[in-house]
Amino acid sequence: GVIELPMADVAGGGIVTGSALMGKKPIYIIRYQGYNWLNCTFIVNYACKSNEIWKIPCPLIIRGIASEGSIGPVAGSAHISVIYKMPGLKIFSPMSSKEYIAVYNKFIKSKDVFYISEHRHSYSNKKEFKNEIKGKKDLILMPISVTRFEAEKAKKILEKKGFKVGIIHLVNLK
């Protein structure tokens, strides 16, 4: 079922951590990644470390939403570096529905905390991305998140200028 939490950015992480400890595998949505500082306090200091240090699984998904440029640099940008070094945390940045389903299927089989860095621009995306690394390349692009859309455009521009360009779309970030 769905439980609507109050807009208290600190309390939600604690509630979700407790739910995960009870075996519920919750999905927690952070409305802006800039609020990772507040929302992830309990998650990174207990849920992520729980299985890693104490062998007590605390599986949950965090959906961190990013939206570069529309609401300012503090709240809307992608802020995954804030929590990147936490033990027991897996970070993904799917930009297509198939990538998202693959990440979710990994989570179902896992005991870890998954942070899914989403971008609002990906919600309307119908395209699937393909890595292109065969053959000799002059350069290889390795974009993440929303930059993957622009990297596809940059690849075409560079190829028109005579460069042999490969691209690796990074989804599994940690």
Positions of predicted regions on the chain:
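Short helix-loop-beta junction
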Residues: 1, 82-86, 150-167
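Thiamine diphosphate
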Residues: 1-113, 117, 122-124
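Short beta->alpha junction loops
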Residues: 4-8, 168-174
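Short helix-loop-beta-strand segments that form the rim/entrance of peptidase-like active sites
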Residues: 25, 167-168
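Structured core elements
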Residues: 61, 115, 140-141, 166-167
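Glycine-/acidic-rich phosphate or pyrophosphate-binding loops and their flanking alpha/beta elements
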Residues: 101-113, 119-160
